[in-house]
Amino acid sequence: MPISGRPIKEAIAEGKRIVKTLSAAHPNWEIINPLDISAGLPKEVWDLPERKRYAAFMGADIEALLGEADAVAFTMGALVSKGCRLEICLANIYNLPRIFLNAADKVSRVEGTDMALCIELRKEINQE
């Protein structure tokens, strides 16, 4: 979900809405919201200059992506967001399935090289 360059309250609201929608549609998925990860960072991080703060947020996001995620979901606008494009590259490099959501926060497609997991995800979202 693109976060930079928009009001933080808007991004937080979108993140909560997406988590709620995906959790309702896919109750066995554990949804990790990047804004929740950032919220858990030490208070000092929030006082850093913008570029260092962004680096800390992205570092925590990447740590969660590589350490906890079985797949990564992307909302509309992901391809114009530097952070989202970085996450897409990481998902490609580490063979994590990429789940793309449409404007209604519904899964529109699943891509990836881990075919067993992609097939499982496609079955779950009725994409086969």
What do the predicted segments below correspond to?
Residues 1-128:
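Conserved catalytic or regulatory cores that recognize and/or transform ribose-phosphate-containing ligands
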